[in-house]
């Protein structure tokens, strides 16, 4: 396998293509974001999206709302012709039902969060597109997706099946140690590529992985130190990284990795929604 280009270089290439295509239009894509409370992870993500939009010349409207007003703001964005994309940033307050995602206009649901959205969820799409760009061969691989959320784990598993992988899905009720070493699986090492997509930071240490495996860390959260962390411990990430040159394996971090790929797909989906409106 050839060496992967750095994620930031890949993102720069894709952004340059978007900038070039945008020159054909007199107006600009407009993304609207709704978020809640004081959540450092949400605040960080919203700031990152604003930075991306500023770089590409998109309009960006981010509104921090009271939970009781969330539906009215979604309705307002839905009815505003100049708003092409809408996202509702998780986590949601307890008083806001998940059905709010289904209230987004499917043609504006650029995060792929609602059941009728015309767009694919950004996180799995971003990861798969990056791997494809680098010539990663999926066909025939044994893939394990750890996590079964509607916007990451499940759609990711479907994409991998469509790419002719043999897919195993684990989740919060799985006994990972037993599942990944069961007779059916032969051993944990029979998994060629593993995607961690759970809501627990630094959950996986190096003992979970084999040196030859490709590890894609998708989960993100704020640690006690106030910083973003992925599903892998720092030691596990470093441990796997040491083997990438020797075994031509791949390891991608959630921090500075899959999170950036998610934002890139959000930009692409917003541009698609914009073009559909022209």
What are these regions (language model features)?
Residues 100-109, 216-277:
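Rossmann-fold NAD(P)-binding glycine/threonine-rich loop
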Residues 35, 87-91, 146:
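Short beta-strand segments
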Residues 28-37:
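Short beta-strand segments enriched in small/hydrophobic residues
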Residues 38-48, 121-214, 218, 223, ...:
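Glycine-rich phosphate/diphosphate-binding loop of Rossmann-like nucleotide-binding domains
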Residues 50-67, 167-170:
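Short beta-strand elements in bilobed, periplasmic/extracellular small-molecule ligand-binding domains
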Residues 69-81:
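Short, well-structured alpha-helical segments in soluble
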Residues 1-27:
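Positively charged, low-complexity intrinsically disordered leader regions
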Residues 4-5, 12, 85-138, 202:
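Anion-binding alpha/beta catalytic cores of soluble intermediary-metabolism enzymes, centered on
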């Amino acid at each position: 396998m050839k060496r992967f280009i750095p994620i930031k270089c890949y993102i720069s290439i894709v952004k340059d293509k978007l900038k070039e295509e945008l020159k054909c239009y007199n107006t600009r894509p407009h993304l609207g974001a709704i978020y809640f409370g004081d959540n450092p992870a949400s605040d960080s993500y919203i700031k990152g999206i604003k930075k991306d939009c500023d770089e590409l010349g998109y309009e960006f409207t981010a509104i921090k709302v009271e939970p009781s007003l969330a539906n009215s703001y979604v309705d307002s964005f839905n009815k505003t012709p100049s708003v092409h994309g809408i996202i509702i940033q998780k986590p949601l307050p307890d008083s806001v039902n998940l059905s709010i995602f289904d209230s987004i206009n499917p043609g504006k649901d650029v995060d792929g969060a609602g059941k009728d959205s015309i767009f694919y969820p950004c996180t799995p799409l971003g990861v798969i597109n990056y791997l494809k760009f680098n010539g990663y061969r999926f066909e025939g691989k044994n893939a394990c997706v750890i996590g079964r959320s509607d916007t990451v784990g499940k759609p990711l598993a479907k994409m991998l099946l469509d790419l002719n992988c043999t897919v195993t899905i684990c989740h919060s009720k799985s006994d990972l140690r037993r599942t990944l070493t069961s007779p059916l699986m032969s051993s944990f090492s029979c998994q060629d590529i593993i995607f961690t997509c759970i809501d627990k930071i630094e959950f996986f240490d190096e003992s979970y992985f084999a040196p030859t495996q490709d590890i894609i860390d998708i989960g993100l959260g704020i640690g006690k130190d106030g910083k973003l962390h992925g599903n892998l411990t720092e030691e596990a990430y470093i441990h796997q990284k040491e083997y990438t040159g020797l075994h031509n394996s791949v390891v991608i971090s959630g921090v500075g990795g899959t999170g950036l790929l998610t934002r890139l797909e959000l930009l692409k989906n917003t541009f698609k929604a914009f073009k559909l409106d022209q």
